[in-house]
Structures are given as C-alpha cells and as structure tokens.
A protein has these predicted regions:
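N-terminal Rossmann-like NAD(P)+-binding domain of SDR-like oxidoreductases, especially those catalyzing
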Residues: 1-219
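A structural alpha-helix within SAM-dependent methyltransferase catalytic domains
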Residues: 21, 79, 116-120, 204, ...
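A glycine/serine/threonine-rich, flexible loop-to-helix segment
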Residues: 41, 142, 229-238
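Hydrophobic alpha-helical packing elements
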Residues: 74, 78, 195, 236, ...
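A conserved pocket-lining segment of Rossmann-fold NAD(P)-dependent short-chain dehydrogenase/reductase
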Residues: 97, 168-190, 214, 218-229, ...
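Hydrophobic alpha-helix immediately C-terminal to the catalytic Tyr-X-X-X-Lys motif of short-chain
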Residues: 198, 202, 206, 236, ...
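C-terminal substrate-binding subdomain of Rossmann-fold SDR/epimerase-dehydratase oxidoreductases
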Residues: 245-371
C-alpha cells in the first residue's frame, strides 16, 4: 500500500514512516521542514542518529514532498497515487498564552481541513490521524460518597498550600483516580486541546460525507529518541532530559505525584500501523470515526519518571519544587482496552528499559522559534 505520512520528518512521524516501510508499505512523506522544528542550514539536527545539515531527514525509501499541509498545491502533489493517509503534521504542546490560539487553529485545524478536502477529491478513503489525551481535560475521578464526578477546578489557595488533589464538587473531599476510556466526555482546556477536538470533528464529518474509514489515535505522554529538546512546547520528558544533559536536576512541579501514562514512540508507531490495517480491512470502515487511547496501560507519577531518567542518565537527583501552574491537569490515566480489542494493540516497551534508552538517545537540536 502507498501511504502518505504528514509530518514525516518529525519526532513521531519519522518513527511511523520507518515502521510503515519495515512492514512493506511504500511511504511518501509531506513535511514543511520548518526551521523552527528542524533547524537551519549550518545547524546539525539529530535525526535517526545522524547529524543532518539544516535538519533535512534522510529517509531511505521515503519520497519526501517538502510542503505545508495548509498549502492545497503541496497536498495535491503529496496525495497523487496514495492509498491511505497517516496525518501527524501539527503544532504541538499545550501553548503558552492566548497569542498561540491563531497558530494552533491555523496549523492544526485549517491544515486538517485542507487535507481532508483534498482526500475527498482524490478518492482516498482511509485515514489514521494523531489526536491526544488532552481532549479529555482532567482524568477520571471517583468520590467515596458520590461515585464518578467531574472535579472542581483546583483552588489557587489549595495549590499554594501544597494541597494538589482535586476535590469533589458535591462534598469537597479529595478524589480517587480511575482510568479514562474513549467514551469519556471531551473537555479541552487549552488551545492545543481545542484544536485536537476540532480535528476529530472534521475527521468524523469527512467519514460521514465520504463513507471513508477514519481512526483517531489519542496519544498519551509519548517519549523516545528524536524528541525535541527543551522548549516551552516540549513534553515534560524532554524538558527533564534536557536539564540532565545540561548538568541540572529535573525540576518537578507540585509534589511529583501527578499520574501519567508514558508510552514509547516505537509503540505509538506500531499503533499507527495496526490502525492502518483496521481502516484497510474494513474494521473501521462504516463511515464514522473511531478513536482509541494509545497508552502503555502502566501509569507512573511524574516524580517516578524524573527519577528513572536521572538514575539512567547518571545525573543529579530531581528536585521537587512545589511550584504549580494554574490549569495543569493533576492526573490522567488511560484505559488501553479499546485499542487492544479493536486494533490488537498493546504497548511492548517496559517503562524502565524505555526510560533507560531515552536517557541516552539523541534529541533534536533546539529550535530557533516555536514548534
């Protein structure tokens, strides 16, 4: 099968392209190779273990179209002769402030709309795309007295006093956590999350209008080789790893007890391969969108992740600062059962060995602008 991978030169997209090729698919890539993400001429960017001038990837066997997913001409060129699309191109991260809203909307929402419209014209009816755990907002919480509840926003006075656990909206008691399934209501709490929900709605509309097969993969905390270095838009794993490389301890906010699901990028790539099989074999071909969590199923705290990285790197022990950011999610832990049932996906990389590898794996060089 000939598969277009948008964002094929990026952190996750490059691993997907490799996995698709290894499975026997013919891969075409579409990537803008923007300097903010991939560096500029004369600056070596680590990619696949190679220092590459200007950050241009050398993917043997990948026909790379250099262009922006918002550009209809570039998208038309990339879609020619393609059987399926794996859409990864996006502006990532949770954003910094309201000034990010236009760019997230432009890149993620408009770009997806341009791609889907072109897929309709080209008669391409198979789509796998990257969504995110951020569409859920806070995770799932249970009160001992009132069952499953949606927690109140955390009170700044509680946070300042070191009380980090969300409270029941009925009785005010601290809540216990549970796993989030795909049926959970969506509650986007920042610009990136809102753009991901919009992508899901666009894909659902495309599937209904065309009868196409669409699978959205809600990635949880992805980590692994080629992750970008520390920027305001990086994931916490990259931020911690960058500090260790600079001889500084990871700074863990709150009390380090925030629970997350850390999933290795190679597992994420394999989930995309299995989703491609699902849309090709009619498992998800009923003219509707099917979304799945992509997660390890083994939650860990942010403090545990920082300690695992520091121990494997041989650096300074993490520092738990007690600092906090208003709007941060306290806990979000995924149920992986939907993807296991329908796609046959189970993560294979254990937390300890994955973090040990990541502690020494090459990172991308710092971007010169937001990415």
């Amino acid at each position: 099968m000939r598969v277009l991978v948008t964002g094929a030169a990026g952190f996750i997209g490059s691993h997907i392209a490799e996995t698709m090729r290894e499975a026997g698919h013919e891969v075409r890539g579409l990537d803008s190779l923007t300097p903010a993400v991939h560096g500029v001429p004369g600056v070596a960017a680590v990619h696949g273990g190679h220092g590459l001038p200007g950050g241009r990837p050398e993917h043997a066997g990948t026909d790379l179209v250099v262009g922006d997913v918002r550009d209809p001409a570039a998208v038309d060129e990339a879609l020619a002769g393609v059987d399926a699309v794996c859409h990864q191109a996006a502006m990532v991260g949770l954003g910094v402030d309201l000034s990010d809203l236009p760019m997230y909307s432009d890149v993620n929402v408009t770009g997806t709309a341009v791609l889907l419209e072109a897929m309709g014209r080209h008669g391409i009816g198979r789509l796998v795309f990257a969504s995110s755990m951020v569409v859920y907002g806070e995770g799932a919480y249970d009160c001992a007295a009132h069952g499953r509840v949606r927690p109140l926003p955390r009170d700044p006075a509680d946070l300042a006093g070191g009380l980090f656990e969300p409270r029941c909206p009925v009785c005010g008691s601290p809540l216990g956590t549970s796993t989030v399934g795909e049926e959970a209501p969506l509650d986007p709490r920042n610009a990136y999350a809102a753009s991901k929900v919009a992508q899901e709605h666009l894909a659902a509309s495309w599937a209904r209008l065309t009868g196409g097969a669409a699978v959205g993969l809600r990635y949880h905390n992805v980590y692994g080789p080629r992750m970008p270095r520390d920027t305001p838009y990086s994931g916490v794993a990259a931020i911690f790893r960058s500090r260790l490389e600079n001889g500084a301890p990871p700074r863990v906010f709150e009390d380090g007890g925030q629970r997350r699901d850390f999933v290795h990028v190679r597992d994420v790539a394999r989930a995309n391969l299995l989703a491609l099989s699902a849309v090709s074999e009619g498992v998800a071909g009923d003219g509707s969108l099917h979304c799945y969590n992509v997660a390890s199923g083994e939650p860990h705290t942010v403090g545990e992740m920082a300690s695992a990285l520091a121990g494997a790197f041989g650096g300074i022990e993490p520092v738990v600062t007690g600092e906090y950011r208003l709007g941060d999610v306290r806990h979000i832990v995924a149920s992986p059962e939907g993807a296991a049932r329908d796609l046959g996906f189970r993560a294979q990389t254990p937390f300890a060995s994955g973090m040990a590898e990541f502690a020494r794996a090459p990172l991308r060089e710092p971007a010169l602008a937001r990415a």
